[in-house]
Amino acid sequence: RHRKRIRMYTYWSSTAAACLLIAAFSFYTLTEYDQSLFAHRGEQKATLFVNNGESYDLLSQDKSIFNANGMQVAQNTEKELRYDTQTSIQKNAEKHILNVPRGGEYKLVLSDGTRVHANAESRLTYPVSFTGNKREVYLTGEALFEVAKDTLHPFIVHTPYGIVEVVGTRFNVNTYEKNQTTVTLEEGAVKVY
């Protein structure tokens, strides 16, 4: 009996040690795999696509990035993308696309002064400068907007599942859920349709 008990103890101890070793190896391997594919949580990382087919990795860019038909596009020290309207020669209908990968986030200031904080796995399409009587952007994913007040030019966010319209306010738009747009209002008023 004593030998049988020792053999059982040895068997179960060896099995537990092997399982623990396999679990530790799997965790290490999967962690390395995830880190190589995705940005770290909260990392200021995004790619900017412009009309001429060029793309810019915003994590590796210096302050000044390029001119968009006379409008200076640059990053400030906080890695925030800005469209400088002071240098704008003319209204520009060119559209840019900001693509934020999994685990990343990125902030930008649009030409009208609206601040946008785009979250992970988000895509924002917007004009270099707003023309006409509306300020329109297109969002897939999630972003926080601090809209510059302009009663004559409403700010409109198009999502795959609806439209959000405001004049000047602070709100969050989330389209991660399938067939659903969630709007969280921090201040002001919005119309959702």
Give the predicted meaning of each segment.
Residues R1-R5:
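Disordered, charged N-terminal biogenesis/targeting segments of membrane/secreted proteins
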